[in-house]
């Protein structure tokens, strides 16, 4: 069998939803699904399939499931000849009687399109597919319950269901026939959730079976988040595969990957921070502007996204993130607004001036200078102070049982680099010069040549946090203006290379530090505790 059975694939739909899974076909995460839609909140609708094929000699499984405690059944992986993820996921199965079947799927804004075709063999070949449904939040798991509604609306070989009130409906258009035969599949095991110490067992509902005659023609199913049972699956599938084949052939893999993070979330165009569980975060959005948009000639879209964010300036701050389900905006980030200022100026340099962006920049800098939430204020030395107990404000934002692991209260080093750059870009040269002088006088660790991670730690004058972290690099690069030059800048690089550099990236904390965590594993609390205490980023 192929190597890397638990290698993961992910196909975005362009609206913030996606399909994802493993090469083996079984799910290892709660986020693995064939139809996961973004309806303001992300819902898992179709988790997977149970699939098998009847040929003249026998019946063979084409799917693989993993159940608690450690049961793998059926074992479609025993017949899996190959898996490829490019240009889209495709599995090739080779059966003992000489039959070979290819199964592929492609995801579009209209849903997930699945296809099966016999590529070798002769004689009868009947394919059966049982969809496994949940209709749950993508952060949750489902257990068997009486509230799940198996009622089906059927037309020809198409069917739809409304699993729960308030959850998107599910429709499957097919080129086969549908037999309504409700059942529950119990105790699926998700090993990635288990490794994190989280709930890892799920029951799934299967409303019926779709059947296809592969000896006569290829099979297709179109999975959608709606009630509509009208439509021809064959033509829709052919159109989707044809359109995506043409689009993907024009775009290099890196371009397609970049586009995966640019989504239409309702009426908003935005950038999401990552898959599978992140939504749109301010800090990540503004940092990503350069690579995802400006470097690719999409300054107009960058301006559109930034102007949308500008509508949410409050007391000189932008939200840290937009929560799932449209909850209250979270403003606990000191650096996000400063990254916005830098992204706005870089965007306007290409796309032209924007009164809306300029207004937002002034509101942010005025708010920070005069003082806003969480103790954020310009101090007498011109540097930016921030923080209060129990609140995480920088990118090192892990919390365990309500405790902030890296509070960094005071004047964090990268925040000063962002603050000074924002002031200089906005033409506030006097404030920028004063803060730069204070930075050079106060942040250099004379003993090592590196920079302190925080000065005036815990808002105590003169107290420093000398932890060696990668945050200091922003003072010498990555931003429009460097705060140090020459030997001082080289000393920072040497310190980072000596203590933090690995073949995979930079450690978040030097191994010599008593708080260093050498491994990122275990349960959620253990992982969050190690997130910024040594983990390589």
What are these regions (language model features)?
Residues 252, 319-320, 369, 373-381, ...:
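Catalytic cores of carbohydrate-active enzymes
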Residues 241-275, 304, 308, 506-516, ...:
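Conserved oxyanion/phosphate-binding beta-strand-loop segments in alpha/beta enzyme cores
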Residues 116, 288, 475:
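Residue-level signal for inorganic ion chemistry
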Residues 104, 202-211, 268-285, 323-337, ...:
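Solvent-exposed loop and edge beta-strand segments that line ligand/cofactor-binding
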Residues 1-249, 276, 283, 294, ...:
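Terminal accessory carbohydrate-recognition/targeting modules of carbohydrate-active enzymes
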Residues 261-265, 309-316, 340, 371, ...:
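A short secondary-structure junction motif
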Residues 120, 139-145, 152-154, 159, ...:
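Aromatic-rich carbohydrate-recognition surfaces in CAZymes
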Residues 122, 133-135, 167, 225-229, ...:
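Short loop/turn segments at secondary-structure transitions that flank enzyme active sites
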């Amino acid at each position: 069998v192929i190597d890397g059975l638990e290698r993961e694939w992910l196909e975005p739909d362009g609206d913030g939803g996606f399909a994802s899974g493993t090469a083996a076909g079984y799910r290892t995460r709660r986020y693995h699904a064939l139809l996961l839609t973004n309806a303001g909140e992300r819902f898992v609708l179709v988790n997977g399939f149970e699939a098998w094929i009847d040929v003249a000699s026998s019946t063979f499984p084409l799917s693989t499931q993993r159940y608690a405690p450690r049961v793998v059944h059926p074992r479609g992986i025993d017949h899996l000849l190959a898996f490829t993820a490019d240009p889209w996921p495709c599995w090739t199965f080779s059966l003992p009687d000489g039959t070979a079947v290819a199964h592929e799927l492609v995801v579009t804004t209209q849903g997930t399109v699945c296809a099966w075709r016999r590529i070798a063999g002769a004689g009868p070949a009947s394919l059966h597919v049982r969809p496994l449904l949940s209709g749950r939040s993508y952060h949750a798991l489902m257990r068997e319950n009486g509230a799940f509604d198996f009622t089906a609306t059927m037309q020809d070989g198409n069917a739809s269901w409304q699993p729960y009130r308030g959850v998107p409906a599910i429709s499957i258009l097919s080129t086969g026939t549908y037999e309504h035969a409700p059942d529950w599949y119990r105790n699926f095991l998700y090993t990635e959730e288990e490794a994190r110490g989280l709930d890892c067992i799920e029951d799934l509902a299967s409303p019926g079976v779709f059947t296809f005659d592969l000896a006569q023609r290829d099979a297709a199913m179109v999975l959608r988040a709606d009630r509509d049972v009208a439509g021809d699956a064959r033509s829709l599938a052919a159109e989707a595969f044809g359109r995506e084949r043409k689009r993907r052939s024009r775009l290099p893999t890196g371009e397609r990957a970049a586009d995966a993070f640019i989504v239409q979330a309702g009426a908003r165009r935005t950038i999401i921070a990552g898959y599978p569980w992140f939504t749109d975060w301010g800090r990540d959005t503004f940092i990503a502007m350069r690579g995802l948009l400006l470097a690719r000639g999409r300054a107009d879209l960058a301006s559109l996204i930034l102007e949308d964010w500008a509508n949410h300036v409050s007391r000189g701050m932008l939200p840290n993130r937009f929560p799932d389900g449209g909850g209250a905006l979270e403003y606990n980030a000191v650096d996000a607004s400063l990254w916005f200022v830098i992204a706005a100026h870089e965007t306007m340099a290409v796309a032209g001036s924007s009164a809306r962006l300029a207004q937002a920049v002034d509101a942010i800098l005025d708010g920070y200078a005069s003082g806003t939430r969480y103790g954020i204020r310009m101090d007498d030395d011109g540097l930016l102070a921030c923080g209060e107990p129990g609140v995480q404000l920088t990118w090192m934002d892990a919390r365990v049982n309500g405790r902030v692991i890296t509070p960094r209260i005071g004047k964090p080093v990268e925040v000063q680099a962002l603050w000074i750059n924002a002031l200089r870009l906005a033409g506030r040269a006097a404030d920028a010069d004063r803060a730069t002088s204070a930075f050079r006088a106060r942040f250099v660790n004379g003993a090592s040549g590196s920079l302190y991670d925080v000065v005036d730690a815990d808002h105590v004058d003169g107290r420093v946090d000398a932890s060696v972290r990668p945050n200091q690099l922003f003072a010498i690069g990555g931003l429009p203006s460097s705060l140090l030059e020459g030997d001082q800048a080289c000393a920072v690089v040497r310190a980072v290379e000596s203590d933090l550099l690995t073949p995979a990236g930079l450690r978040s904390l030097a191994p010599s530090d008593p708080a260093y965590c050498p491994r990122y594993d275990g349960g959620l609390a253990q992982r969050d505790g190690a997130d910024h205490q040594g983990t390589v980023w």
